[in-house]
Swiss-Prot record:
NAD(+) binds at A34, T117, N118, A119, D120, Q137, H232, T233, T234, N258, Y262, I279. The SirTM-mediated ADP-ribosylation can be specifically reversed by the Macro domain-containing protein encoded by the same operon (SpyM50868). This is Protein ADP-ribosyltransferase. It comes from Streptococcus pyogenes serotype M5 (strain Manfredo). Changing R192A: Dramatic decrease in catalytic activity. Catalyzes specifically the mono-ADP-ribosylation of GcvH-L (SpyM50867). This activity is dependent on prior lipoylation of the target protein. May be involved in the modulation of the response to host-derived oxidative stress. In contrast to other sirtuin classes, lacks protein deacylase activity, being unable to catalyze debiotinylation, deacetylation and desuccinylation of proteins. GO terms for molecular function: NAD+ binding; NAD+-protein mono-ADP-ribosyltransferase activity; NAD+-protein-aspartate ADP-ribosyltransferase activity; nucleotidyltransferase activity; zinc ion binding. Belongs to the sirtuin family. Class M subfamily. The lineage of its organism: Bacteria, Bacillati, Bacillota, Bacilli, Lactobacillales.
Amino acid sequence: MSNWTTYPQKNLTQAEQLAQLIKEADALVVGIGAGMSAADGFTYIGPRFETAFPDFIAKYQFLDMLQASLFDFEDWQEYWAFQSRFVALNYLDQPVGQSYLDLKEILETKDYHIITTNADNAFWVAGYDPHNIFHIQGEYGLWQCSQHCHQQTYKDDTVIRQMIAEQKNMKVPGQLIPHCPECEAPFEINKRNEEKGMVEDADFHAQKARYEAFLSEHKEGKVLYLEIGVGHTTPQFIKHPFWKRVSENPNALFVTLNHKHYRIPLSIRRQSLELTEHIAQLISATKTIYQKS
């Protein structure tokens, strides 16, 4: 790894090292998971969850919002009572995250592409170029046929607001349940299901094609695979592909921003760096150093 002049350097702070590696990189492939939004305060546990869903917690003893969002509700009226509030909280009304703004200022100076397992609004509200983002797990603001009868997504924020306003006893009025125009099955949120997968429409495939083209263009050279807030729930989307590409490019570097330690394959440990400081604080400090250098 001698081709990276700033790796490794133990005399640097984590922010100093990250800033220098970004500056030195020919290109960045950035994988972003739930930990980055959580670092900005958009957590799925605690008061944020408990304030929005006290009735659902009382009925089902949910431990967190992720568990609740994946629950098999008793009917579509209850499903949409929960999901409408969930969509408003995590998509329509979620404010901008400072770490996303800070990261954008850094990335705009580089050749980069982002893949994310997040389905919230974080990139849109922060003003990212959509052509540089691949939402591989779907988006909370979109709907799909619950039977996956055709590959098209839909959107109607007004109906979501109406569901929230008119729901009673954890049920939305039956007439507000959206239905597929092709097979008349109820709509559901466009989010990948472990068993069923998800609807992947033309826009999804366009996002995927742009991402894959970027990867093809940067198989060689100093490519920084930067993983931010990615756990081990769905490693097949970011973590494992990053490992593979780093192993195939002796000039690539794998850098993780995460307060947790995850096992890194022995084969790429000499090309890896773990940064464990608070994600939002580390990105902010990195931006300051990067812009001064």
